[in-house]
Amino acid sequence: SYGGYAALVAASRSPNAYQCVIAGAAVTDPQMQVDYYRYRLRGSSKLEQLAMWDDSISPLTEVDKVNVPVLLIHGDVDQRVPVDHAEKYLAKLVDAKKQHTYVELEGADHFSNTLFYNHKTLLYSSILNYLADECGLENGMMPATSPTKIEPKVAQQP
């Protein structure tokens, strides 16, 4: 969530500072996240932790400055950072005609230990394909000479 947020903020910084960014379950609207937690944590002592978002940059307001391809990944039942964040950011990317890829993990929550085999297969194959196609990296490490497509195989849950 914070790593995804940081990636999206980085995507709008100095041109060519990065080749591309991958944002998983990113907070795209800090105020929306604060409101979400205030509703969920009514009266909780954890409310003080929300102060970190008070002066945060909103990636939503920075989309016009995005200067690298963006891979946005989000689970559609994320309990920590609602998928609304991804949907709002995706709409802004489309409106601004920014290069992007969106992968929504159906039935996936926020944390990797809640992902099933089919989620992980789609997640990792999407990342590898994105790195090869959009970032010029093969296998996520070296410049691509001839990118190899990895087709995700989705396993059926019993």
Where do the language-model regions lie?
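Active-site-proximal cap/loop segments of hydrolase catalytic domains
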Residues: 1-158
